[in-house]
Each structure stands twice: as C-alpha cells, then as structure tokens.
C-alpha cells in the first residue's frame, strides 16, 4: 500500500517544513519548483529518530525555466522527516516536496 506525505506545499519563501512520520522504506522524495521565467531553489531534506536533532540526508538543487524537479530514493526509515527551502528565487516561484513509499 502506497503512502504519500506532502512535506511542503506551495512554499514561496525560505521555510522549515513541519515534521512528519516518515513513510516506510524503500521510498522516494521529490521536490519541484514552478514560476515564471528563470526559477531556482534549494531544498534540504532532514530526518531524525530522537525527536530533537535533525540530520540533513539530501540537498536538492532545483533550477530551470518555469519549472524544475529533483529527487532521490531512500532505503532506510527514520522516525520523522521534513523538508526545508533554504533558498528560492524567480517570479512567482513556489516549491512543493512529496515523500512517497
């Protein structure tokens, strides 16, 4: 049974997303950006087991004309995950990030 979690929805500024229970492994995480003209963003994906300290497991660089996407697969499950937009630029640029297992 597949499980999808929206880690970020229409993020238009730098932001730390909320913590979510990580979907079971194996799974994938995909971030995308859309806007007008040249758009770019950097999305960090963090995990933790202790409920306190985050560990960045992947940094996704998104860059394109009107849209771009990047992602990765994971094979280990952590208790929680989140996505963070650490940089974003471009007219009307918004970032989405989804975890799927």
Where are these regions (language model features)?
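Short Trp-Ser/Thr-centered turn/loop motifs at beta-strand boundaries
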Residues: 10-24, 48, 70, 92
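Noncatalytic modules at the cell exterior or secretory-pathway interfaces
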Residues: 25-33, 74-93
């Amino acid at each position: 049974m597949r499980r999808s979690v929206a880690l970020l929805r229409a993020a238009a500024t730098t932001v730390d997303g909320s913590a979510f229970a990580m979907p079971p492994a194996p799974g994938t995480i995909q971030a995308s950006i859309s806007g007008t003209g040249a758009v770019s963003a950097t999305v960090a994906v963090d995990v933790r087991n202790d409920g306190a300290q985050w560990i960045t497991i992947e940094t996704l660089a998104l860059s394109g004309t009107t849209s771009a996407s990047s992602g990765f697969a994971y094979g280990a499950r952590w208790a929680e995950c989140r996505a963070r937009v650490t940089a974003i630029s471009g007219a009307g640029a918004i970032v989405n990030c989804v975890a799927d297992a």
